Design a protein with these regions (language model features):
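Conserved active-site alpha-helix within GNAT-family acetyltransferase domains
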Residues: 91, 95, 103, 115-133, ...
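A short, internal acetyl-CoA/4′-phosphopantetheine-binding micro-motif in the GNAT/acyltransferase core
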Residues: 78-85
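Helix-loop element at the rim of GNAT/NAT acetyltransferase active sites that forms part
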Residues: 10-24, 66
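Active-site rim helix/loop that mediates acceptor-substrate recognition in acyltransferases
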Residues: 24-45
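Glycine-rich acyl-CoA binding loop
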Residues: 48, 86-91
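Conserved GNAT acetyl-CoA-binding A-motif
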Residues: 101-113
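A short beta-loop-alpha structural element at the N-terminal edge
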Residues: 1-11
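Conserved beta-strand in the GNAT
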Residues: 47, 53-62, 74
């Protein structure tokens, strides 16, 4: 995503945060997500457009896989505006994420979803990805 397109994604990011019951902080978002504008060593922010309207985004974080001794990509965020769900935009963002990770030489693309997000799980099952047998843990460090 370019600098010129950046301001258009911030309202979608806030919508994504509200979906997961987090209270958006516009100033913090503006600083944090700027690090993913291309080119970036931290990751990549991808947008999905329908005409002039930004209707979805994905955030990739560059990371590592010790078991494979290789770089990997984590699709940490995937969001499609409510009025555009079911139009293939989520699948297109996953495919664009996989392409971007592959072009960067990543071994694999991984992502997580909430256990009760069955809509997203149905989408993910269509990508050819395999469901992991791992549990995801989170330790707050505040």
């Amino acid at each position: 995503m370019s600098e010129a397109e950046y301001e258009t994604v911030l309202p979608l990011i806030a919508g994504y945060q509200r979906f997961y019951l987090a209270e958006p902080d516009e100033d913090r978002n503006r600083v944090f997500f700027r690090r993913f504008l291309a080119p970036s060593e931290d990751g990549l922010l991808l947008g999905a457009w329908k005409g002039d309207e930004l209707v979805g985004f994905a955030t990739l974080y560059w990371t590592f896989s010790s078991t494979h001794a290789a770089e990997a990509a984590l699709m940490n965020d995937l969001f499609v505006a409510e009025g555009h769900r079911g139009e293939g935009i989520g699948l297109a963002l996953i495919q664009a994420s996989a392409t971007a990770a592959h072009e960067r030489g990543m071994r694999h693309l991984e992502w997580f979803t909430a256990l009760d997000n069955e809509t997203a799980q149905r989408l993910y099952e269509r990508t050819g990805a395999e469901r992991s047998g791992w549990y995801n843990y989170e330790l707050l460090l505040e």
